[in-house]
Amino acid sequence: MEESDRVARRWEDLDIDILVKIFQSFDIIELTSGIATVCTSWRMACCDPLLWRTLDLSMMKSNFIKIPLEPYVYVDARSDKTLNHLLKTSLSLSQGNIMTLIFHFNLYVSDDLLTYTAERCPRLRRLVMPAWNRIKKTGICKAIRIWQDLESLTMPSIANPPYLLEEIANNCKNFSELKVMGPFDNFFAATIITYLPKVRVLSLRCSMLVKDTLISILDELRNLEVLNISHCLLIEIPPPPAPRRIMRELDQCILDKASRLREFLTCMKDSCLMCQRTRNDEGLMRWYKYEEGVWKADEVSSLSL
């Protein structure tokens, strides 16, 4: 073929579907690094819904120090600026198509940024929450009112759960999955029973769990299909003056009550590394001590990241 007959095809002339296929191999940092500004066709490809079903920010952690006053953390300004740029660019490109949003548990998102995010991904179905410290009651409640399609929530434990779960009950009619990371007491269980009685999947893995609280869940959540208490520190509190004791195995009463479930996921093995870690941390997992990303695991496939 003569040189004059050759036709050089430019990158910007590539078919949109091909560009989308290429961009699917990019991570979130690359997608938001400016490739959408190259030309019109690249921006169209960058905005394709296929790229934005899930926004995974689980690799992002805040650079912070603990302080004695609320919100008990001080976040470095540069860290905040990086998150703001990445999140706002992603939300602009996604054009409201994000259905799964994943934050790192050590990411300290501001109240204003959470509200901004909710307004720009109203179709959200699954949320993995960041740390609570900088999020106010008004902010999360406003977000939940927007996220009416929410079905699944993974959240750090919270001292006052009723206002949050009531908001979910009032606004998220298809809500069915809840994972709580951190302390889970009888008050939290009673709140779920009151406001989310139709929840079908509940994961409490790697938490401290009192036997009576577990029995309440099994007795009262009649729509529950899947319960994960793997690696939990299960405590029995007998009447005084007897001391509380750590249960090394489930008794027949619990097994009988759990037999109605489709899946009852447990692990209480002395040889299990995660069980050892929960015991060593006294039921309050210090995830920062362990391998990066180990907090994402869950024996329930729909909750694993």
Positions of PLM-derived features:
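The conserved beta-strand core of Leucine-Rich Repeat
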Residues: 1-305
